[in-house]
Amino acid sequence: MTERKQITIAQMETGQSGRVVNIGSGRGMKRVEAMGLRPGKRVTKISGMFGHGPITVKVGGTQLALGFGMAQKVMVEVAGK
């Protein structure tokens, strides 16, 4: 049986995929949901800058760039190792 764990998009490794389970509140988060990043959607981390730079994710056929603060507010369920 595969263990599932919840982490933020900021904590994901490049190329890792998961399912969005929660999106925190705050400035700009409603816009992120309107662009397709919402609970239940599958998301893949495409790239991220070392440190606190922007993070690119793929949701469906769309790529979104998230600021580091926004990426910390999106909880994703991923397969554990």
Map each language-model feature to its residues.
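Compact, glycine-rich, soluble single-domain proteins
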Residues: M1-K81
